Amino acid sequence: MHVRATPAMHRLIGTVLILACAFASAPAEAGFRSPESLIRNVYAYYGNGSPEVSDGLPRDPDTARQFFDPSLRTAWASAKSEPYDFLVQSPTWRVGPVSISILRKQYDKTYVSVAFDNMGRSVRLDYILVKGPDGWLTTDVESPYDSLRMFLDQFKN
């Protein structure tokens, strides 16, 4: 039995191939659809384990473009000698469940509180997120003692 391809099948196959090529060659998109999605994706890089199992949020330019606004991207991608990972407040981690709550929405800016246990120690950070044309990005992260911007500025190479 011989199956004959119709013009509609040719168009469908052509469309699928074009879409596959477009998605395969597209760089990582910047931003996320919601503040919660951005936070969940940050901490997904820390996994259920420790630095031996997970390297945390990568320091490459593509990841920086996806998670940070332009003013913070270069600092994130270029810092290499920090004494600890600011996003978990420790050089080692075993991150427990992450609690996310919106503190305040202000035009295109949203303040998000993030809390979790890291190896039995309670950690609370406040993310300042901005909404741009590509979605939500991090403009800063504040701990009770420091901010990500100031922290990265201290250790820039």
Give the ranges of each region predicted by the language model.
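Bacterial N-terminal signal peptides that target proteins for export
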Residues: 2-16
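N-terminal signal peptide c-region/cleavage motif recognized by signal peptidases
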Residues: 21-27
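Surface-exposed, charged secondary-structure patches
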Residues: 31-32, 65-121
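Soluble non-cytosolic domains of exported or imported proteins
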Residues: 32-37, 58, 119-120, 146
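Short, aromatic-enriched amphipathic alpha-helices that serve as compact interaction elements
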Residues: 33-51
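Surface-exposed patches in mature extracellular/periplasmic domains of secreted proteins
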Residues: 50-60
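Low-complexity, intrinsically disordered terminal/linker segments enriched in charged
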Residues: 104-109, 119-122, 140-157
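Hydrophobic/aromatic beta-strand elements that line small-molecule binding cavities or substrate pockets
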Residues: 125-130
